[in-house]
Design a protein with these regions (language model features):
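Extended polysaccharide-engagement surfaces of secreted carbohydrate-active enzymes
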Residues: 1-171
């Protein structure tokens, strides 16, 4: 109930579960009562079904994944060469710490990026209960691999330096 606390959570699992999204590796982040990294949620099923979208097909080439809110491009996770996560892949908790000054979780995301990268691992840490570190360790399979790091936020973003953005929301 501390309004000044920092909260972070990371999603593992598989896109192929019932009502699943391609959000494996995604994180949520709230600090000082402000939501910084968010999940947009799903689309209203009836609205999509009346437009002919085949929602309940969860195969890799399904129309379901063309719905923006259901694919990895709309979540706080990674994308490689603008491809979808592999629906047959599954990630789990591979390591964690619940020590008060360095809480973290680690997951090998490689199974959801099959044939896209050799290895993709993500660690999300809450350090000293004050700040969050998202660390990705990627080993590419090709000489050129385009990686996209996405964070969905309701905040306004301003580029302040090379590779540095300032997020502002609620003062």
């Amino acid at each position: 109930n501390d309004s000044s606390a920092v909260y972070v959570g990371m999603k593992m699992g598989s896109p192929s579960v019932n009502h699943g999204h391609m959000d494996v590796g995604s994180f949520l982040l709230e600090a000082d009562g402000v939501l910084w990294g968010m999940d947009m949620g799903g689309e209203e099923y009836n609205r999509l079904e009346t437009r002919g979208v085949e929602l309940w097909n969860s195969r890799q080439n399904s129309q379901r994944w063309d719905v923006y809110r259901y694919n990895n491009f709309a979540h706080n996770t990674l994308s490689f060469n603008h491809k979808y996560q592999d629906v047959k892949g599954k990630a789990q908790i591979d390591g964690y710490s619940d020590q008060e000054n360095n809480m973290y979780v680690i997951s090998d995301l490689t199974p959801v990026y099959k044939d896209q990268v050799k290895s993709a691992k993500r660690a999300v840490s809450l350090v000293d209960k004050e700040y969050v570190v998202v660390e990705d360790v990627i080993e590419a399979t090709k000489r050129f691999t385009m990686m996209t790091w996405t964070m969905v936020t309701p905040a306004s973003a301003k580029i302040v330096a090379d590779n540095v953005m300032l997020l502002e929301k609620d003062g």
